[in-house]
């Protein structure tokens, strides 16, 4: 029983007794017949009546209080649908081009939203699905050397070529792999993920994105002087674009909130920069090419701490959020809400992030009818005499009896999604609806926590 019920009952009973006393003072004749005139020695029948009314009033009061979160939930779902949604797991994934594959010579594109699957440890083969957030183009290319030039003297020869006053610099040496020639490659832009631990990636990002004065490049085996250098455009930040979003975007939502949500969930997803027009430098570099970035200031953290492993090619952020056709939702006319279960065989392996589409079916499974969200923009465009609408509601998942007795796999509980139908024009139209087909964005709940990462080059999750 709700522990708040006793407090609400006492409040209601006190209120009834006080108002009864005031009523008895103003209307003595009526109060005398009701037994309210002497509250210190009340009529036992009237007292039982007051206690019963107080009990019913307390239950109604608690019900109204419990409805307020539902009201705010429906309101937020209409104006800011991502506020209440669970936060999916995010990580950085890396791709490796297959050496000798002729397809990568021209650049093999791995499109955004490509699904990647992994197996959760000790979970009977449960699959965890991630989707990439960036386009990744694979080239037979690698960074073989990385050197941070931390003094004005070290960058003086390069600064003279670029005609800038630089205090520090970064030299990256690119080489082709798989027997390919560097001059065969023509990447219009090359995204690089700044990997590493502690402050190294952040300092590199700050210098490359905010303190670059010039970018120059030439063949690593070039014996020419200043004539062999090529000036390249400044590097660009990568990952803030709308077409690089991990979380679903909404026109009615503030774009900055999406960026903040992604940053606090996985700050590494923004540690991407792009080098531009490297094909011009590669054209004159059959074996290897040196690219030098010149900075306006030096930082004491980076000298001696920068290695090729800090610059990951062919990486992209990924999110455990994907579309899924859920199992049919059977309707019971005696229940006003129905549980949306993504997979009845593995109910705890999925969590609904957002409902995308609902279709109603009759008992004969014919004449499917679309069901629109009630509290959403555009709902008024439907004919309310014919249309069906649904209202989703999130609830915190409760522990099952088995979970209460045995150990849970993690501390995360997550949420459950319930759905209710309404027909504003005529409620009897719901009698023909036998079940619902639901398509939604889902996550794998806490299964990403159970993934095992092996190797020395594991990327953050």
Provide a role label for each language-model segment.
Residues 147-148, 173, 179-398:
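Short, low-complexity Pro/Thr/Gly
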Residues 1-222, 229-232:
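Extended assembly-interface regions of large multimeric machines
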Residues 138-142, 239-244, 460:
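Short, surface-exposed linear segments at secondary-structure transitions and domain or protein termini
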Residues 362-461:
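C-terminal domain/tail detector
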Residues 93, 106-109, 114, 300-322, ...:
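Surface-exposed flexible segments
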Residues 98-100, 121-122, 197, 295-300, ...:
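Short, flexible beta-strand-to-coil junctions
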Residues 11-12, 18, 22-28, 47, ...:
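Glutamate identity and glutamate-enriched acidic tracts
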Residues 27, 74, 82, 134, ...:
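Histidine (H) residue identity feature
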């Amino acid at each position: 029983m709700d522990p708040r019920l006793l407090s609400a009952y006492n409040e209601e009973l006190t209120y009834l007794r006080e108002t009864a006393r005031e009523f008895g003072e103003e209307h003595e004749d009526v109060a005398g017949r009701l037994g309210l005139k002497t509250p210190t020695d009340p009529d036992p029948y009237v007292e039982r009546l007051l206690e019963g009314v107080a009990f019913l009033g307390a239950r109604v009061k608690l019900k109204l209080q419990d409805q307020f979160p539902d009201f705010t939930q429906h309101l937020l779902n209409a104006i800011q649908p991502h506020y209440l949604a669970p936060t999916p797991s995010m990580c950085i994934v890396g791709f490796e081009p297959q050496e000798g594959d002729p397809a990568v010579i021209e650049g093999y594109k791995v499109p955004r939203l490509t699904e990647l699957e992994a197996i959760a440890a000790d979970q009977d083969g449960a699959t965890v699905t991630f989707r990439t957030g960036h386009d990744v183009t694979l080239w037979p290319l690698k960074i073989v050397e990385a050197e941070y030039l931390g003094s004005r003297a070290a960058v003086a020869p390069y600064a003279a070529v670029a005609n800038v006053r630089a205090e520090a610099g970064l030299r990256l040496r690119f080489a082709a792999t798989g027997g390919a020639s560097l001059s065969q490659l023509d990447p219009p832009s090359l995204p690089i993920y700044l990997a590493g631990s502690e402050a190294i990636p952040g300092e590199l990002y700050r210098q490359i994105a905010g303190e670059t004065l010039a970018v120059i490049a030439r063949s690593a085996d070039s014996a020419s002087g200043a004539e062999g250098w090529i000036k390249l455009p400044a590097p660009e930040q990568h990952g803030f674009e709308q077409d690089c979003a991990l979380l679903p975007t909404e026109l009615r939502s503030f774009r900055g909130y999406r960026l903040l949500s992604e940053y606090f969930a996985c700050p590494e997803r923004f540690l991407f920069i792009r080098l531009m027009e490297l094909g011009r430098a590669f054209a004159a570099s059959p074996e290897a090419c040196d690219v030098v970035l010149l900075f306006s200031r030096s930082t004491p953290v980076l000298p001696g701490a920068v290695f090729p492993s800090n610059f990951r090619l062919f990486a992209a952020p990924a999110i455990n959020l994907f579309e899924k056709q859920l199992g049919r939702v059977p309707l019971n006319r005696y229940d006003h809400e129905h549980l949306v279960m993504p997979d009845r065989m593995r109910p705890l392996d999925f969590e609904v992030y957002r409902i995308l589409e609902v279709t109603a079916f009759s008992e004969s499974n014919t004449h499917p009818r679309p069901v629109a969200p009630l509290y959403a923009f555009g709902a008024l465009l439907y004919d309310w005499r014919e249309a069906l609408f649904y209202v989703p509601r999130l609830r915190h998942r409760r522990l099952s009896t088995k979970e209460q007795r045995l150990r849970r796999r993690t501390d995360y509980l997550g949420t459950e999604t319930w759905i209710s139908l309404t027909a504003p024009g005529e409620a009897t139209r719901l009698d023909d609806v036998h079940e619902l087909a639901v398509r939604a964005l889902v996550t794998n709940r806490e299964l990403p926590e159970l993934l095992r990462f092996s190797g020395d080059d594991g990327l953050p999750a």
